[in-house]
């Protein structure tokens, strides 16, 4: 049996969310099928697979490696093979850098063209794009936005089902993610960065981190804490001024 043949079975039996399955298929078609698709399941060229992984950006390589492991985990489960060519393979370390985001005043000062309303809505409510794209006027009532689904189906987790105070600017989002991402990129940010705008707004207005966790729909409080520890250069300057004022009062 060829890897391509087995993968078609995997898509039917693997237990993942529809969005995850969509991503699996895209990754396989783009990166893995040209390399291992025509190889026998029991005789994948490990060197060729490793070379492919090393040729990819670290994050893509990591996702592809996890997908190969998933494909062969299912193969072992269904007695198709007893090997996994992904065992022992490595990918380059993922470099984590500070993610750029805009503060609310910066967002509000910019012209976002045809997406003026939608961008401001994202920045003031902290919804994931897939959540915001599923919102209709019926989901906005009693001065709250009720988040109960995404464009891909159910919410990411139970904690993603929530309500957030409605602060205006609602206008239906486009059916595709790409136009708004292109709009955001022109200003050096991403659509997802507007969640950080919202989180930073909560932080600067004194909203407690546990409340922010609820509003952002984070299942892990550490995710919220990582956002809450975002510090702008201006805050460093302000901290210096505060300490200087304190010392001057003591003298």
State where each predicted segment sits.
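Short, structural beta-strand-to-alpha-helix junction motif
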Residues: 1-6, 40, 136
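Short, basic (Lys/Arg/His-rich) helix/loop patches that form interaction surfaces
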Residues: 112-116, 125, 177-222
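Catalytic-site neighborhood detector that most strongly recognizes the C-terminal catalytic loop/helix
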Residues: 151, 216-241
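Short, basic, alpha-helical segments at the C-terminal edge of helix-turn-helix-like DNA-binding modules
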Residues: 241-247
């Amino acid at each position: 049996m060829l890897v391509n043949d087995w993968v078609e079975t995997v898509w039917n039996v693997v237990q993942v969310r529809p969005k995850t399955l969509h991503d699996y298929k895209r990754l396989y078609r783009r990166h893995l099928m040209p390399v291992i698709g025509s190889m026998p399941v029991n005789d994948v060229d490990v060197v060729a697979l490793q070379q492919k992984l090393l040729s990819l950006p670290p994050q893509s390589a990591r996702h592809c490696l996890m997908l190969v492991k998933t494909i062969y985990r299912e193969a072992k489960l269904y007695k198709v093979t007893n090997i996994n060519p992904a065992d022992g393979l490595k990918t380059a370390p993922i470099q984590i850098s500070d993610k750029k985001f805009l503060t609310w005043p910066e967002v509000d000062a910019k012209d976002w063209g045809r997406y003026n309303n939608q961008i401001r809505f994202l920045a003031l409510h902290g919804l994931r794009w897939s959540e915001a794209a599923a919102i209709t006027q019926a989901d906005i009532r009693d001065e709250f936005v009720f988040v109960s689904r995404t464009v891909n189906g159910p919410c990411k987790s139970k904690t993603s089902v929530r309500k957030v105070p409605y602060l205006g600017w609602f206008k239906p989002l486009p059916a595709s993610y790409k136009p708004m991402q292109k709009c955001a990129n022109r200003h050096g940010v991403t659509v997802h960065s507007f969640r950080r705008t919202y989180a930073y707004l909560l932080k600067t207005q004194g909203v407690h981190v546990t409340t922010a966790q609820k509003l952002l729909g984070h299942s892990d409080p550490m995710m919220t804490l990582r956002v809450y520890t975002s510090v702008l250069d201006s805050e460093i300057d302000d901290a210096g001024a505060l300490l200087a004022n304190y010392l001057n009062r003591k003298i």
